């Protein structure tokens, strides 16, 4: 906001102080002085608006494009054919050349040009916009041409002065159709300028030529490669061709008059002879050649439906640097509160950086343009973090060109664009999911025209979900406004669909009559979830269960409590019951609880009151004796395990979920324990069985086992007991005496080098893979 406030103060001051005083002179080189305050304001303005010096080129190219747009519009109603003094016609393009000996960078356009008065008005007074006045003329009916005026890039009077970031001296030669003479505006940015007829005469025919005498620390801009790189970054999609003059080495050949004429042409690839060129001993000479830089046209400005899929793919590769085709794309135009064009792409591979949780790192995948001029790609939230894998461009006519990124960040217009972008992005995903489902169901997918969307020829949403499902689930936690849209995009495997993903809506559509909610179970893999004892109960009741296999799912369900009016129910939590009890059954359940109360109190005391929150009779239809579940309103064992693994803090390392022990009274081992308990509470066998069943149930539920060594010893005791071995039975004595070894075998063994048998076997095993 500081830059925004400064800009307003500066512009107001310029309006008050922007008058100029013309010194006496003959009008051909007499300096024209700004007031001292204006000179100071110029310095503040340049240094506060522009932190990257390379933007001067963006500004000058934008101005040149603006001038070309103006003449194109004017010539629609009043065409003219101006010529230079040498009889050459100006071209509808921008050209950049160099004079390395003089450290000069030269930019030339064939645009509308300026008269002497316009040079003084637009360049001799800060804050004046030539484009603004041009639009005023159009609105007054001078050369009205409909919507074309919206293509003009504005605020010439401010952007031009960024040239003094790199230039010690600037000369602007300009020729307008409204003037017979070509004039030069010249300044060092020191509070004064010169305005005089160009002594070279009419060298332009029409247009403007800017010659920048570069500062010593800005001579990198004498490099064609640097200029081309800057053009690609900022001005790739300007409407008019941009040529850069380069020196190339070519074989020395005798030129014919015809070839010489071709070299003098201004078409792309035309060559200008360097009068100082010298051939080497190999017959090679250096020539200057015009190279077209902005070959990629702004396809987003074309009508949606008139761009082929191949063109979208080619454009994506050009602007993103990715050699692969995108997975999806969406080309759309938004009109209303804010107007903008956009094309969004989904890459076919995941960038690991997209999982970074560093909010300070900007997302550079979305490039912001204003009237086809690149402004920035360093927004932290043009798309939210969970959509930072999406690449694309946004081009708006409603944003100002010459403001800082910081000011844009606070722009109301930009906030509207952000909201629209998120909705359009999620809409793209939903469209692809719908196409994918239609294909899977054998339906014909229609591609409405005009489209601009990816048209699927085969199912592709599964790949998208496997690549970016984690990002969408993150969105549920970060973006409550779009939570419902996001959950419709979720896909999971289930107990009825182990090989294919289904949506939550598909699950709801095929729920059993009277089913309470959406049942799910999380785990490291489908294979592990299938072995869960709590899944057995659901399968026995013919209830479908969603399989959640990503760690982030545990966090998601803490935010996503329901879908389509159906509650999400975790099978790993206590109290899961698929059948309602009638009155008689409730009485039976109450009496059964009374029967086992003292036994359950004993078990809780045995395992520890601090570890087991309560012991209950399970209502699950299962073959397991014990099931350890999580308390209904607390975190699950899996989430606690994930949090311990993700955090280095002592508190989280000790984090555990509350345990509820569910006991299956119908299991034979439980029945045996109960009988022994009624006789002797301290029965050793019953105690060992209880501990082994409890620790095993903990492992199945992903709860940690407190004492693994004790667990191992109890299993050992139970195994001994099962084969009638006493706990006191010790190891057998060595059986060496059973083996007969002759003296000869001993002598032969002594003669052999000592070999590590185990190492030898490992080496043989390692070598098997090479056969």
Curated annotation (Swiss-Prot):
Gene Ontology MF: a single term: ATP binding
Residues with glycosylation annotation: 63, 306, 402
Region (Disordered): 254-282, 727-771
SUPFAM superfamilies: ATPase domain of HSP90 chaperone/DNA topoisomerase II/histidine kinase, HSP90 C-terminal domain, Ribosomal protein S5 domain 2-like
Span of the signal peptide: 1-24
Gene knockout outcome: Defective lipophosphoglycan synthesis and reduced levels of the surface glycoproteins gp46 and gp63.
Family stated for the protein in its record: Belongs to the heat shock protein 90 family.
Protein name per UniProt: Endoplasmin homolog
Taxonomic path: Eukaryota, Discoba, Euglenozoa, Kinetoplastea, Metakinetoplastina
């Amino acid at each position: 906001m500081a830059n925004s406030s400064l800009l307003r103060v500066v512009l107001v001051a310029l309006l008050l102080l922007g008058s100029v005083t013309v010194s006496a002179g003959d009008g051909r080189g007499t300096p024209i002085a700004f007031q001292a305050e204006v000179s100071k304001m110029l310095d503040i303005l340049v240094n506060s608006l522009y932190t990257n010096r390379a933007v001067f080129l963006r500004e000058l190219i934008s101005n040149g494009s603006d001038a070309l747009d103006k003449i194109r519009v004017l010539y629609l109603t009043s065409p003219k054919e101006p010529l230079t003094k040498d009889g050459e016609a100006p071209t509808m393009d921008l050209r950049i050349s160099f004079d390395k000996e003089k450290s000069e960078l030269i930019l030339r356009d064939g645009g509308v040009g300026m008269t002497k008065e316009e040079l003084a008005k637009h360049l001799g007074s800060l804050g004046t916009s030539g484009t603004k006045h041009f639009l005023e003329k159009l609105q007054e009916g001078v050369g009205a041409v409909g919507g074309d005026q919206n293509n003009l890039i504005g605020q010439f009077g401010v952007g031009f002065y960024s040239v003094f970031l790199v230039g010690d001296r600037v000369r602007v030669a300009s020729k307008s159709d409204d003037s017979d003479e070509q004039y030069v505006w010249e300044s060092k940015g020191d509070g004064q300028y010169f305005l005089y007829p160009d002594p070279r005469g009419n060298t332009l025919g029409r247009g403007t030529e800017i010659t920048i005498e570069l500062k010593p620390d800005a001579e990198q801009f004498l490099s064609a490669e640097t200029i081309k790189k800057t053009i690609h970054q900022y001005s790739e999609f300007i409407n008019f061709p941009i040529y850069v003059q380069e020196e190339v080495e070519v074989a020395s050949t005798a030129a014919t008059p015809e070839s010489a004429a071709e070299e003098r042409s201004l078409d792309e690839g035309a060559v200008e002879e360097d009068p100082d060129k010298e051939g080497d001993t190999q017959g090679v000479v250096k020539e200057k050649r015009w190279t077209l830089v902005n070959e990629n046209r702004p396809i987003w400005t074309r009508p949606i439906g008139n761009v082929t899929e191949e063109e979208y793919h080619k454009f994506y590769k050009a602007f993103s640097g990715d050699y692969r085709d995108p997975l999806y794309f969406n080309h759309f135009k938004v009109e209303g509160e804010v107007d903008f064009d956009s094309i969004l792409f989904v890459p076919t591979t995941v960038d690991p950086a997209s999982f970074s949780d560093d909010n300070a790192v900007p997302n550079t995948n979305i490039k912001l343009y204003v009237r086809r001029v690149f402004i920035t790609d360093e927004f932290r939230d043009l798309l939210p973090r969970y959509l930072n894998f999406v690449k694309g461009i946004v081009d708006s006519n409603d944003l100002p060109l010459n403001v800082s990124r910081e000011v844009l960040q606070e722009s109301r217009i930009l906030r509207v664009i952000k909201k629209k972008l998120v909705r359009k992005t999620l809409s793209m995903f939903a469209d692809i999911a719908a196409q994918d489902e239609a294909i899977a169901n054998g339906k014909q997918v229609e591609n409405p025209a005009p489209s601009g969307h990816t048209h699927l020829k085969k199912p592709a949403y599964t790949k998208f979900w496997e690549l970016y499902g984690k990002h969408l689930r993150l969105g549920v936690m970060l973006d409550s406004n779009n939570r419902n849209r996001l959950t419709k995009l979720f896909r999971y495997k289930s107990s009825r669909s182990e090989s294919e993903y289904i949506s939550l809506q598909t699950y709801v559509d095929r729920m059993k009559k009277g089913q309470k909610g959406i049942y799910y179970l999380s785990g490291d893999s489908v294979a592990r979830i299938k072995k869960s004892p709590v899944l057995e109960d659901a399968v026995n009741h013919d209830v479908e269960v969603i399989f959640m296999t990503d760690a982030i799912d545990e966090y998601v369900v803490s935010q996503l409590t329901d879908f389509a009016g159906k509650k999400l129910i975790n099978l790993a939590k206590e109290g899961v019951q698929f059948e309602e009890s009638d009155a008689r059954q409730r009485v039976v359940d109450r009496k059964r609880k009374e029967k086992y109360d003292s036994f359950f109190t004993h078990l809780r005391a045995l395992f520890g009151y601090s570890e087991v929150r309560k012991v209950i009779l399970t209502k699950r239809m299962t073959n397991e004796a014990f099931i350890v579940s999580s308390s209904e309103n607390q975190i699950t064992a899996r989430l606690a395990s994930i949090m311990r693994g993700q955090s280095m803090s002592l508190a989280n390392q000790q984090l555990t979920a509350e345990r509820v022990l569910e006991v299956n009274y119908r299991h034979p081992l439980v029945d045996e324990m109960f009988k022994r308990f009624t006789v002797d509470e301290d029965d050793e066998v019953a105690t060992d069985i209880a501990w082994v069943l409890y620790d095993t149930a903990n492992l199945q539920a992903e709860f940690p086992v407190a004492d693994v060594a004790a667990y191992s010893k109890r299993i050992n005791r139970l195994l001994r007991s099962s084969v009638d071995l006493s706990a006191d039975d010790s190891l057998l004595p060595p059986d060496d005496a059973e083996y007969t070894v002759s003296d000869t075998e001993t002598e032969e063994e002594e003669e052999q080098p000592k070999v590590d048998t185990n190492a030898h076997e490992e080496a043989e095993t390692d070598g098997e893979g090479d056969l």
